[in-house]
UniProtKB/Swiss-Prot annotation:
Region (SOCS box-like): 151-180
Membrane association, as annotated region: 171-172
Membrane topology according to the record: Peripheral membrane protein
Region (Interaction with host APOBEC3F and APOBEC3G): 54-72
Protein name: Virion infectivity factor
Lineage: Viruses, Riboviria, Pararnavirae, Artverviricota, Revtraviricetes
UniProt GO MF annotations: metal ion binding; RNA binding
Length: 192
């Protein structure tokens, strides 16, 4: 029988971002307790030699698993050091990979206080609402005019240390194409 290959998306990430991600996850799991229910699996708890860590984030009856890797083949640049991350959504026997933006949105539907559009309705009804969003990485669209006005009124409070964002983990110089000036002044286009 021949070898069977399984292809999966792994975002190339430098090791310092992975270290930051791991320490933020551990801080919010054990110190601030904002990541309640999250499970951190160390490299020595995995049977796969390339896995450096796994973070299991319960989302209702599903789970989001952020896996970091080491010892991967390097890319074409010298700073592609063989580190990476993959993001997988699992429910029972079904699993699929998700992109970092969707992962942050999924996390935000279950974790971290938010002043969202539903909060405007609750405030009008006289209910007490959270005055700010702790996890802006979980929003990828522009809010309503009411939301933008209230958000401008209440300045976001910087959380030290920041909450762990999957988008921040995977964004880097080789995952986001560099913006360059076009031939018409300041218009931008993707450069290669």
């Amino acid at each position: 029988m021949e070898n069977r290959w399984q292809v999966m998306i792994v975002w190339q990430v430098d090791r310092m971002r992975i270290r930051t991600w791991k320490s933020l996850v551990k801080h919010h799991m054990y110190v601030s307790k904002k990541a309640k229910g999250w499970f951190y699996r160390h490299h020595y708890e995995s049977t796969h030699p390339r896995i450096s860590s796994e973070v299991h984030i319960p989302l209702g009856d599903a789970t989001l698993v952020v896996t970091t890797y080491w010892g991967l083949h390097t890319g074409e640049r010298e700073w592609h050091l063989g580190q990476g991350a993959s993001i997988e959504w699992r429910k029972k026997r079904y699993s699929t990979q998700v992109d970092p933006g969707l992962a942050d949105q999924l996390i935000h539907t279950y974790y971290f206080d938010c002043f969202s559009e539903s909060a405007i309705r609750n405030a009008i009804l006289g209910n007490i609402v959270s005055p700010r969003c702790e996890y802006p990485a979980g929003h990828n669209k522009v809010g309503s005019l009411q939301y933008l006005a209230l958000a401008a009124l209440i300045k976001p409070k910087k959380i030290k240390p920041p909450l762990p964002s999957v988008t921040k983990l995977t964004e880097d110089r080789w995952n986001k194409p560099q913006k360059t000036k076009g031939h018409r002044g300041s218009h931008t286009m993707n450069g290669h």
